[in-house]
């Protein structure tokens, strides 16, 4: 159960994966729910059985973010929306891959926070939850996606300092490989996508939702800053050492 001081929550990327699983957790809480996504067809079906508000929005549209979110009175913002385009690295990513993924994975987070956090400061309560990644904490062969999630890590850390004394909390959730649609958007080659999402038991969206809800459950004096969550069979941090074949020496 989340801390009772929170009366409203906004979840971005709420129609699938981690966002959808997190949304479902709030159905058991006494809280006003706002579920945001570009495609709301799944949310419309879910709303037939559960009470919550749907916000249809394209997070690539900065003006729309401010127009629709600035007047909302939100106690918890869960910035979860994201895309894996460009995850194969800067050499394989197209210019469009880089622009699109940076817009959603980094810029939309900043604009969403800019629109909502002032209300939290005014009320002297609130909780910001940012979806990071192990790719943002440990070097991997993913300079585009890893760089973007590295930016989220620094944003989370710096925002905590910026909000010091406001009683607004900031938590970053950093999952390892999770059974979502990430692989499909990250790799143009279906076989590579399948290989990326195999080889060991992946995390599931409910595992990440557990971590999010835990960060929201602690007493007001506690702030869960960063949660790293990886599969039991996944050990982040190590990278393979690949000898360079120098044509001059061979």
List PLM regions with ranges.
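Conserved glycine-rich cofactor-binding loop
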Residues: 15-16
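Active-site-adjacent segment of SDR/Rossmann-fold oxidoreductases
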Residues: 158-168
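Catalytic Tyr-X3-Lys loop
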Residues: 91-110, 125, 129, 152
């Amino acid at each position: 159960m989340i801390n009772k001081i929170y009366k409203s929550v906004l979840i971005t990327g709420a129609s699938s994966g981690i966002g959808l699983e997190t949304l479902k957790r709030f159905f058991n809480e006494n809280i006003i729910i706002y579920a945001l996504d570009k495609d709301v067809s799944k949310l419309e079906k879910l709303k037939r059985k559960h009470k919550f508000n749907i916000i249809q929005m394209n997070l690539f549209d900065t003006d729309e973010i401010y127009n629709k979110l600035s007047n909302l009175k939100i106690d918890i913002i869960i910035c979860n929306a994201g895309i894996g385009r460009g995850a194969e690295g800067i050499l394989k990513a197209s210019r469009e891959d880089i622009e699109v993924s940076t817009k959603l994975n980094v810029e939309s987070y900043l604009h969403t926070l800019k629109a909502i956090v002032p209300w939290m400061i005014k009320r002297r309560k609130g909780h910001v939850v940012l979806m990071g990644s192990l790719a943002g904490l440990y070097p991997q062969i993913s300079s585009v996606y890893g760089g973007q999630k590295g930016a989220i890590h620094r944003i989370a850390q710096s925002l905590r300092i910026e909000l010091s004394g406001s009683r607004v909390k900031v938590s970053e959730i950093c999952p390892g490989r999770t059974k979502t649609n990430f692989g499909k958007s990250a790799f143009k080659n279906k076989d590579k996508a399948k290989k990326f999402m195999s080889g060991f038991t992946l995390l599931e969206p409910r595992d990440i939702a557990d971590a999010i809800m835990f960060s929201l459950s602690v007493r007001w004096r506690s702030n869960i800053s960063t949660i790293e969550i990886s599969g039991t069979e996944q050990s982040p941090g190590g990278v393979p050492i690949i000898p360079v074949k120098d044509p001059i020496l061979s």
